[in-house]
Amino acid sequence: MSTPIDNIPFFKGLPIPSLMTIMNVTKTLQIEKGKNLFSQGDEADGLYVLLSGKMQVYIFSGHVGGTTKVLADLEPGQFVGEFGLIDGDKRSASVRITEAGEVLFLPAIAFAVVMDNQPVVAQAVCDYLCEKVSGLPRITWTSPNAKLIHEKNVKPSLSNMKTLCKIMREHNKQTAVLQKG
């Protein structure tokens, strides 16, 4: 049995009942060409999986009214908002709809309830984040806490997941600055 969330890395390998629980709290939304799904600086409200159509992820470079830098063109099956789903931080990029279609929306509030009630989901998300963080270049794994991350031995709490997301966001910002300069 396949679901639209099977392609999301931190949901891979979850048992079917857990996937179905997550799917039960999602909503399908129509998206219109030329509109933004969300904008850089908006409050994060959840994760979006592109079911049909196309979207473009971009950031504003420099001052208001300045140019934009395209980070990615998204096709059906791809997703945005995974960090915001967990940490609730403001959106770090904007997403423009370039071809009308549909997205599957997973609200952050509903997902938090799923994680509270399904430890297997919380563990899968935490393991995925540990894997992402441990794969970052230029990070030294010498402290006891860093070793826990590297060994995926982190308690799957929302607080720990937010910390892992923060590390990823900081790394992404530093990478963007290095690419700019």
Regions flagged by a language model, labelled:
Residues 18-21, 90-92, 109-160, 164:
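A small-molecule sensor/coupling module
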Residues 157-181:
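Intrinsically disordered, low-complexity charged/polar segments
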Residues 5-61:
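Regulatory nucleotide-sensing modules
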Residues 47, 73, 105:
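Short aromatic/basic micro-patch
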Residues 63-80:
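Short acidic-glycine-tyrosine-enriched beta hairpin
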